[in-house]
Amino acid sequence: MKKIIKWNKTVSTVILIGIIIIAMMCSNICVRDNYYIKEVFNEEGISSKVNIIPKPMSYQSKEGKFILTKGSAIYIKGNTDEETEQIRWIAEFIRQKLSLSTGFPLDIIDSDKPVNGSIYLTTINSNKELGNEGYEMNTTSKGVKITAYKPEGISRGVQTLRQMLPPEIDSNTVVDNIEWTVAASVIKDKP
């Protein structure tokens, strides 16, 4: 019986990773009229457009921006050890993706007490009404927090995070002279 339970957890984790990889690959596909462009103004008054595909349920811009640096880390915490492990797989995937273009190590830390300048992925104190794939992403100058009811929602949230960064984030080699910023905002979405 224990082998079956362990096998089921392993299979669940492998399936989740597969879904994450497919979703991340598909996130670059533009669906007509199903995207969101928000004009955001930086501190100098220069506008930039934020493209989010698919269009989120709500987007509220705030003042400021988060800057991803070589000292940034990814903090993870689930409601259970199993959720934390699933979130770790998502964090590993996004770390690999972001590190290619930024060159930043982005350590993954198992803690519900993220420090300033970090990304925090969690299911703690989440909103059940968002469903299994919904998420809330709150970005301030101090950090990015993606909260979801289930790890599947965190997977969708990190796709949005990736889209909020400069387009050079998709480079397979380190890009120099880029400030890796995310506009301060609150985004809520569910399929």
Residue ranges of each PLM-predicted region?
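Hydrophobic membrane-insertion alpha-helices, especially the h-region
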Residues: 15-25
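N-terminal Sec-pathway targeting helices
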Residues: 2-16
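Position-driven detector of the extreme protein N-terminus
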Residues: 2, 25-26
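Acidic, contiguous N-terminal accessory segments
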Residues: 22, 28-190
